[in-house]
Amino acid sequence: MKRATSHRIFLLSPAYAGGERARMILRDQAQFPLARKLHGKSGAPIADVFTFLSGLYFRGKIAYANAFARPARGTSGVLVITPTRGFIDARTRIRLDDLREFAEVDIHEADPRYRMPIECDARDLATKLSAQSEVVLLGSIATGKYVDVLLANFGQRLRFPADFVGRGDMSRGGLMLRCAADRQELSYVPVAGAIVNGKRPPKLAPRKYAT
């Protein structure tokens, strides 16, 4: 029997803020549209910034989460995990100093700059969700940097797409874009006790998407 779910929240792992694309957008001389927004007073949506930093993987995550989130009234259905600010609504605008702050912290479960805000937000979110709700992690479950913090608060409510097993980031991004475009939701399994590694699935056939 299929598990009845009242609400579904997506947690998106962050883009790396210390790489070449981050340095590109952080440059004072950067003049492309997203950079001008980030450098301006109003900033740019964190989803747009992380999509620029990560490319296909984050683009797939945000498209998929927006397509299938079922949040409770008055709450966000798509939250981005950050290196220093806990969970942030994917629509939140960030500025230059925010991205620089993210770049200073490499996510690790033992780093209090990362762990303390995440634990606080996870506890708060857990109290607002019913036992039938699901929190779906769109990110790696192979290390403890997300799982160790989240499982303690969400337990069996913490899930991930079963089709992620055996796929790399690019394949996951392509799969999620395809599912969002086709309105075909993936199946989710509990993170607790999940098989982390598996046989690599066949490559996805190429497909073009509107930008």
Feature locations, PLM:
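Peripheral peptide segments
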Residues: M1-T211
